[in-house]
């Protein structure tokens, strides 16, 4: 399903074993450009796509950002050939801030080259403000070398911003709001990349383990952490 310049409201639906063979777009759903995608009480299972195993969201330059709200849904065993095992979202030089919202969702067993569950990527200096609240992440795997089954990392998120000509990160372009997300393993990482070095989550993050998950680089800070 491709949503472009229109609105799609998906409720109480199952998306099973869909595949997108294009170079972009999610295995089940692709929201493109000035559009609205609202997903509630849906299940995305064993879908496969190039960017976003289940859902891919692509902003386009000089247009309003897509409006995305995903709630109370399950993403299980989806595979992305590239970024975002379950969901991939990217912004461009849009005329407004891209602010997708994902709440009360479960991500389990998804696989992508960058971000086993989610990849959020700002391809321009335009600010991106994703919100993630009350989500569960378990056994989502990131494998940059998709042809090598021995190289897997448990990485839930991959968030990266635009870099300059010298491959240095520009000022913060991805500003996530993360609260009360539950990680089954402490190694369910937030990041696999340090393109935005100064990201401050300033959120309540709960880990179902005895130690904080690792960080590969950058100067991330967390507040109000709880381990159970």
Feature-to-residue mapping (PLM):
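Right-handed parallel beta-helix
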Residues: 1-51, 63
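Predominantly extracellular beta-rich ligand-binding scaffolds that present long acidic/polar faces
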Residues: 31, 36-48, 56-228
